[in-house]
Amino acid sequence: MSIKYLGLSEVNGPLVVLEGVKNAAYDEIVEFTVNNQEKRRGRIIEIYQDKAVIQVYEGTDGMSLNNTQTTLTGKPMEL
């Protein structure tokens, strides 16, 4: 089951921090919707309490703290 969040807490280089996260897992695949159209992917690389640090594969340029939609897919990274 996927869970969606609106907004980000912090953007720093290729990493973003999402607060208020529940039931997230290490290495979980994350999908971002930027400006209601562009899709990007990433994975959770650290979880602490209700915060998740996510590595964004396509970079964070143009990602808004207020309008970026984040979807936790509930699926681990697979090769």
Model-predicted regions and their roles:
Residues 1-4, 10-79:
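Acidic-enriched and Gly/Ser
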